[in-house]
Every structure is written in C-alpha cells, then in structure tokens.
C-alpha cells in the first residue's frame, strides 16, 4: 500500500460517521413535527429507519475503502497506522466516543469480526474518561420560583417549542404544584428550583419534558409526559419525581427516545445525576445511540470480568428449547446462544430466530420486551467457563464454537439484561406480591398485543421480573404480529367422548390460536388461577383478541404509559370544574 493512504482511510471513516450522525440528527429533528401532526405511524417508521442508518452508513464506508485500496489485503502494520491517524483526529471531535464505535464497526465489517484486539480496535476509548468538548450552548435552563411555582411552571411551559394549543394549562400547573407540595411540603418546595433540558424527549405518542428538581435534600428527576387529546390539544398526564420512576421511563425494555443531541456525551453526563442506577451503556441506549451502547456494554462486561473470580454458569430457570442461556453469577446480564438443534416441537430455523430478535429491536417494545445486543465471534477464556457449562456448550452449540486452546470463540450470541424468571418469582412470592406479579403479567400481554405483538409462547418461564417489579417478555422465537394470527373459539364437542380424546375434534391450521387453552397453562396453580380469572379472564376469549386485531387493522395506535394508571393526573386528582 502507498504511504499516506492510512490518513485518507482514517479521514474517510470519520467522514462516513459524520454523514451517519448527520442523518441521525435529521431524522430525530423531525420528531416534533410528527408529534404535532399526531402522525403515529410516521413515528414508528422513523424509529425503524433511524435504527437502520448506522449499518447502512457502515456499509457505504466499507465500499469506499475497498475502492480506495483496490480490494487489496492490508497487513497488521498498515491497520495499526490507520488507527493511529484516526486517534489523532479525535481530541477536538465533538462525538469522539461514537466515532470510535463506528471505526470498530467498519473494521468488523471488513474483517468479518475477526482479530478483534485492543491494538486494532477501540476496545476501550482512546480519550480521557467522560471528556467532551466545551458545550457551545447549555443543555438545560434554570428556573427559580422568585414569584412562586405557578409563575415558574408557566414560564417552563411557555418556553416549550410545541405549537399546539393547550387544553387547560392552569389545570396542569395546579396538578404539578399539588404533586410537588404533597411530596416536599410547602416550605421545602419554596426553597427548590428546576433545571429543564432544552430539548424535548419524544417517544411513542408523548413528548417528555426532562428536568432536575433541585431541593434542600438533593436533586430529583422531574419528568412531565405531554400528550394530545383527540382534538389535538396538549395536556400533561402526570409528574414523575423519583429515581425509580425515572429509571422505568428510561428502561431497557422501552423504545429509544428521539432527542436532538449533537453532543451525546454531554447529554449522557447530564442525565447521569437523575438516573444514578443506569450504566453508561443504558444511557446511550435510551437516547438512541444503540451501537455505541453496545460498545459500552461490552466494556462494562470486560471491567466486571477483570474484577471478579466467577465462572460462567447456565442461567437459572427452565432450560430453553431454542436458546442456551448462561451468565456470571454476580453480573446483571445473560448471554444467549442459538442451539444447533431445537426441540422437536420447535419447527423453525436459526435464521427465523434471528429475524425475530431483529423484529424486537426495530419494533415499539412498549416497556415489555427486553432489548438485546448482538455479537459475532465472541471470545471467552476457558478458565472463566465452568466445566458443566463447557460440556453443555459443546453438546448444544458445538457448530457455533471454535476451540483456540485456552479460549473458545462463539460465532454468534446475544447479550440481554438479566431478570428473575417469572415462574421462579411466582414460586417465591405470595400475598400482594403474587397479586402484583399476575397483574403485571396480564398487563404485559395486553400492552404487547396492543402494539401488534403476539408472544406466541405465553408460559411464565418466557417472562422475567425486573428490579422494579415489572414483567418483561424475553423469549422471542415464536413472536409474530397480532395481525398474522387467527384467533378461534373452540367449537362445541360433537359427543361427550370428544372431550376425553387425545386429539382435537376440530381442524387446526398453522396460525390458529385458541385463547381458551391459555387457561390450562396459566391457571393450573390454585394460588394463581383465581387471581387470573379476576383480573385477566378476557385474555381467554377469542373475541377479545379479534377486537384488538380490528383496532390495529383500522390504524389505531394505542397509548403507552411508562407509569401506573393510578399515577395519571386524570385518575389521581378530580378534574377541576
């Protein structure tokens, strides 16, 4: 290769990233217009297209580089010089951290995810931790109650860029003050002030005002979800002011926010104070930088692995028929490998399973489906793998494993947040906790269905419980769109003997689902059956599911709330006359 080509290649990669992030910001900047026009289908399409931008631009850069090098192979020394030049371009670059991830992605695409070493890639960042360039304008604005909180909140709302009419601005301000007074007391509220992000956070059918409530006791989140009435008027649905509530809003089972962030590192740093339980990876994920979140997630894994003496073990729970799942006992994530052969009742291919996981990545997860990061050629030290797990890996996924002596390489796997399997949770709880879990499970099914997702396999073992007690679906191999399912009533039996026969007395076609059968799987436990019948009996009726299908086919997009119904102002406070 001619000398000097290394710098050209480095510049080409960085320019490619510039183009990608420019398009990312362009799609994001349309969120306000989509919200104001109540174009919810465009919201869903924009979410999908923004996810695809990254891989598309990586592909464009790879093609450029193949043209520049005339398709010639490059030696290790050449690649190291390219990385050196690229590193020198980053100190004054405003999005250095994601630019490093983009470099990694281009390298992996060129070299088929092989030879992934710290010398060749930005396994860890080349820049000082949490460094970002001086911010050209503040991320947030401070508001003080010099003339009381009513005046403060009126200024906050008046500063919003939204151009729609408000249904009742005074009512909403009254509700917010009432909530804050109940939480802090009048005297403490008078000594508090707000810092509000300049950009709104858009997701689904809501625009979120995100701020910090600075009180005498410390800083709290201040989140206001802004919705529209059927007449296109704005209203504030609730006010959330605890870290637990904020954590759920920014949770790993939700779609990414659309928030205009030309300096993502600065925004992540600003959010960190009100989301102390979130890792760097989770914060980048929440604002839509999912590929860099994958980089940060891998770094968090490496740091944990370096500081522990644990070995990988099979994850607790009922062993899956499609996936082999393992974890580190103290780590908050699980690793999922598609098995070489599935159980006989699972008539599907590995390609189908991967397509299902991609569907979840692109779809509105409504807080009920765990996000995943996909890895290829994932290297594990054998000393970190328990003998029992190693035996299981070789038994169930040998075709995906390459033995390198002291290491193995797993050709393909997913990393996902670790949860307590719902079936295990239900065995361990009773009373109100049991009731809450069954209520959450039914709500998860309803919300998935309203978002045009049918889980397929609805057994408790395919759901997990988060640290906030939310029930989340995580087994995607039988997932499909609601509109693809034929929900049927079981026909009346012809003779009494039909009910005792081993085979059904009626025909069953692919895609047929009989909701009445759910009762046999979900209500067998005498502790659970009565609760299910009380709260979710309609899930056993085919007409319930068909009615949902009709709403979806008519183009209706359901509201999705990242908080309990009882927290909504319309439920919590009686509307003013």
UniProtKB/Swiss-Prot annotation:
Query: Keywords of this protein's UniProt record, alphabetized?
Result: ATP-binding, Cytoplasm, Glyoxylate bypass, Hydrolase, Kinase, Nucleotide-binding, Protein phosphatase, Serine/threonine-protein kinase, Transferase, Tricarboxylic acid cycle
Q: Please provide an example of a Pfam family that matches this protein in its UniProt record.
A: AceK_regulatory
One Gene Ontology term from the biological process aspect of the record: tricarboxylic acid cycle
Binding residues for ATP: 315-321, 336
Query: Annotated Gene Ontology MF terms?
Result: [isocitrate dehydrogenase (NADP+)] kinase activity; AMP binding; ATP binding; phosphoprotein phosphatase activity; protein serine/threonine kinase activity
Q: Which residues form the active site?
A: 371
Give the subcellular location.
Cytoplasm
This enzyme catalyses:
L-seryl-[isocitrate dehydrogenase] + ATP = O-phospho-L-seryl-[isocitrate dehydrogenase] + ADP + H(+)
Main localization (coarse): cytoplasm
Mind telling me which GO cellular component terms the entry cites? cytoplasm
EC number from the UniProt entry:
2.7.11.5, 3.1.3.-
Which InterPro entries does the annotation name? AceK_kinase, AceK_regulatory, Isocitrate_DH_AceK
Q: Which HAMAP family match?
A: AceK
Job of this protein? Bifunctional enzyme which can phosphorylate or dephosphorylate isocitrate dehydrogenase (IDH) on a specific serine residue. This is a regulatory mechanism which enables bacteria to bypass the Krebs cycle via the glyoxylate shunt in response to the source of carbon. When bacteria are grown on glucose, IDH is fully active and unphosphorylated, but when grown on acetate or ethanol, the activity of IDH declines drastically concomitant with its phosphorylation.
The entry sums up its family as follows:
Belongs to the AceK family.
User: Which protein, by its recorded name, is this?
Assistant: Isocitrate dehydrogenase kinase/phosphatase
State the organism named in the record. Escherichia fergusonii (strain ATCC 35469 / DSM 13698 / CCUG 18766 / IAM 14443 / JCM 21226 / LMG 7866 / NBRC 102419 / NCTC 12128 / CDC 0568-73)
